[in-house]
């Protein structure tokens, strides 16, 4: 184990099963043709939990069931997740199936149903095959925990699993935070199809955890966009089981800032991996905005840039077309003074004082041939800073989504 100072946060190899007292599993139950499609995270003790959900008017059945679980109390012992079928827009039967899924898994664990969260992702409007779900739950009982199995089970059109892990010191105790996520298309959260699961062995007050998650989600998961589409099933769930045996964290605790920073890093990692793995994507795009009127304006501008199809296609085509960036900034809802906007790409200034600046097209093109592109916007409206992440738009995005159900 790494020896940590009180203000040190270290990224380590790990996932949602790395914090003490957690295990994760994934199996193939038959919802997908061959890949794993049913995953669970289990805590050995009740975990203080917090969640944020999709803002879609068509919230999926599993979202409603998870909300019901957390209404009964702020603790969970497990979450069960299926891929392939979203169980969204499926009426009363879909809601019944989600509750049955919760009860079946709770029964296997010997716990109250309200201690289980439920999540689904996949095709909208199709019902779950409950025989396969029940068979999968039985299979999970006999399946050993395995690194990466849960992460694989929650994927849909994703091309890679998404996981991260950090360690930090709280009051002389080593605390671990692990994360897993899925998301590739329909990504434009407030919350998009994106699921995030974070586990930690820290002891935390529920109110502080829920507030931190909302604040962090706004500057991480809600600052990514792949295609501007929002899903019915988005959810980010955090479970904190206290197995690190630290003094319970509250907002007034001296170690709260370092824990909150580690939680932010965890969510940022997952958010960027989702953006990087956008359907058909070849490049991660990050927009950094400095000197906006406030942080809200900065985040609005940053997300407008990475969400612009014209910017995304220019990046794919390695074309340093700064006019597309200006176009995105220009129709944002933020306060913008044209003469005070500067645009930088790969260290070169492309635009300043409301006019183009001389720059090397060849150097810009070479920079755009990389797989991580950062666009920097400098303003003089105030002290607001913000970031957002997206990806390029390629021909493969159309191919993937034109045949999504076939």
Curated annotation (Swiss-Prot):
Modes of activity regulation: Feedback inhibition by L-arginine.
Keywords attached to this Swiss-Prot or TrEMBL record, sorted alphabetically, are: Acyltransferase, Amino-acid biosynthesis, Arginine biosynthesis, Autocatalytic cleavage, Cytoplasm, Multifunctional enzyme, Transferase
Q: Which transformation does this protein catalyse, written as a reaction?
A: N(2)-acetyl-L-ornithine + L-glutamate = N-acetyl-L-glutamate + L-ornithine; L-glutamate + acetyl-CoA = N-acetyl-L-glutamate + CoA + H(+)
Q: Name one GO cellular component term.
A: cytoplasm
Give the matching SUPFAM superfamilies. DmpA/ArgJ-like
Q: What class of enzyme is it?
A: transferase
Q: Where in the cell is it found?
A: Cytoplasm
Q: Where is this site: Cleavage?
A: 192-193
| Biochemical pathway | Amino-acid biosynthesis; L-arginine biosynthesis; L-ornithine and N-acetyl-L-glutamate from L-glutamate and N(2)-acetyl-L-ornithine (cyclic): step 1/1; Amino-acid biosynthesis; L-arginine biosynthesis; N(2)-acetyl-L-ornithine from L-glutamate: step 1/4
Which N-terminal stretch is annotated as signal sequence? Answer: none
GO MF terms held by the record: glutamate N-acetyltransferase activity; L-glutamate N-acetyltransferase activity
Biological processes per GO annotation: L-arginine biosynthetic process; ornithine biosynthetic process
- Primary subcellular site in the record, as a coarse category: cytoplasm
Active site, per annotation: 193
Please give the positions of the paired cysteines in each disulfide bond: none
Name the residues that bind substrate: 156, 182, 193, 279, 401, 406
Write down the EC number.
2.3.1.35, 2.3.1.1
Site-annotated residues for Involved in the stabilization of negative charge on the oxyanion by the formation of the oxyanion hole = 121-122
For this protein, the record's PANTHER family field holds: ARGININE BIOSYNTHESIS BIFUNCTIONAL PROTEIN ARGJ, ARGININE BIOSYNTHESIS BIFUNCTIONAL PROTEIN ARGJ, MITOCHONDRIAL
Please state which protein family the record places this protein in. Answer: Belongs to the ArgJ family.
Function statement? Catalyzes two activities which are involved in the cyclic version of arginine biosynthesis: the synthesis of N-acetylglutamate from glutamate and acetyl-CoA as the acetyl donor, and of ornithine by transacetylation between N(2)-acetylornithine and glutamate.
The record's subunit annotation is: Heterotetramer of two alpha and two beta chains.
- The name of this protein is Arginine biosynthesis bifunctional protein ArgJ
Query: Organism, per UniProt?
Result: Bacillus subtilis (strain 168)
